[in-house]
Amino acid sequence: MVSAPSGAGKSTLVNVVLARDARLKLSVSYTTRAPRAGEVDGREYHFVDAGTFQAMADRGDFLESARVHGNLYGTSRRWIEGIQAQNLDIILEIDWQGARQMRRIFPGAVTIFIFPPSLPELERRLRSRGKDTEIGRAHV
């Protein structure tokens, strides 16, 4: 599991690691967040509306789920179980709430927390993403 505040560099690090080892599979989370420019449904996230997400949660489709900055995120139980059945390793790019839930389910999982280079750099990254809002500043 790789966890970090928004803008710390999780995705960059995960993409480098995935490019080096084809045996690693990235879990693509479900979210109610709107896609950012350049994001593709099913690649960065599975983008769903709140009603669909809640129905999935009610059915037990998620191993973990969390509300982060007003949006819902969840990890697919079926996908994780399918990859485990193939004896492949999984990378979860996940927030601290999800990481805590997953550690309870998989206590032997390796957890990596990434810190941003500095608070000013983190703020710069968040502003460049268009997160120059109260929520964006709350990250810092």
Question: What are the roles of these predicted feature ranges?
Answer:
Residues 29-90, 96-100:
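ATP-dependent small-molecule kinase phosphotransfer cores
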Residues 3-5:
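P-loop (Walker A) phosphate-binding loop of NTP-binding proteins
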Residues 8:
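ATP-binding Walker
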Residues 90-95, 105-127:
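Conserved phosphate-donor/acceptor-positioning beta-strand/loop module used by diverse small-molecule
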Residues 18-27:
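Post-Walker A helix-loop "phosphate-sensing" segment adjacent to the P-loop in P-loop NTPases
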Residues 138-140:
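Conserved small/polar residues in nucleotide/adenosyl-binding loops
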Residues 14-15:
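The feature captures the helix immediately C-terminal to the Walker
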Residues 11:
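Walker A/P-loop
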